[in-house]
Amino acid sequence: MKICLIDETGTGDGALSVLAARWGLEHDEDNLMALVLTPEHLELRKRDEPKLGGIFVDFVGGAMAHRRKFGGGRGEAVAKAVGIKGDYLPDVVDATAGLGRDAFVLASVGCRVRMLERNPVVAALLDDGLARGYADAEIGGWLQERLQLIHASSLTALTDITPRPQVVYLDPMFPHKQKSALVKKEMRVFQSLVGPDLDADGLLEPARLLATKRVVVKRPDYAPPLANVATPNAVVTKGHRFDIYAGTPV
């Protein structure tokens, strides 16, 4: 995949070249999207809109730390949707990981989560965030046990993941109507990189065959159900719903 690669570390140690080779990235000086290695982290920038700033994965500080410490925990909609109850903490495959926010919430309340991400740039951002998270004294121990990244397309990987998870979680890219600055910034940069998930409808059936208990699909409240398969079961929040489908028991 072609993208502009920029090294701002000043170390001259070739780390960016190693990273590019690992993820199959090819430097393209004219690309509007840039993957930038800074002294702190790896980030994605839209070069023609510098005011949007860089997008990076941060499990340790910022919004994720606030959500972990002061969020709803087990009361969060995504936790309710996957079925967390009492001692039951399902094993989850997040088949559309993105920046890993929902996966992190599930891991922080005790679930084991395997994240699938097919876009190599997004996978590189996730991997960088995980590496910093794993090294953190406060969360590193449980994060290594509970949150993993698999760089693969869900369309193919969902058929051969072992062991089978109890829950498959899907949050396909869907055009957002929200006006919040964060969503607008991230969605603009993200959609410039990966575009909408035009093949997302093809994920529902393999997800239902893989999950032993249920499939959870996060949708904006104005979006039709995935693959136009309606379900009466959903956890509804302001602006979103988590549609719940039966999986395939062992």
From Swiss-Prot:
Keywords: Cytoplasm, Methyltransferase, rRNA processing, S-adenosyl-L-methionine, Transferase
InterPro entries (UniProt xref): 16SrRNA_methylTrfase_J, SAM-dependent_MTases_sf
Location, primary (coarse class): cytoplasm
Catalytic activity: guanosine(1516) in 16S rRNA + S-adenosyl-L-methionine = N(2)-methylguanosine(1516) in 16S rRNA + S-adenosyl-L-homocysteine + H(+)
CDD domains: AdoMet_MTases
Family stated for the protein in its record: Belongs to the methyltransferase superfamily. RsmJ family.
Name of protein: Ribosomal RNA small subunit methyltransferase J
Gene: rsmJ
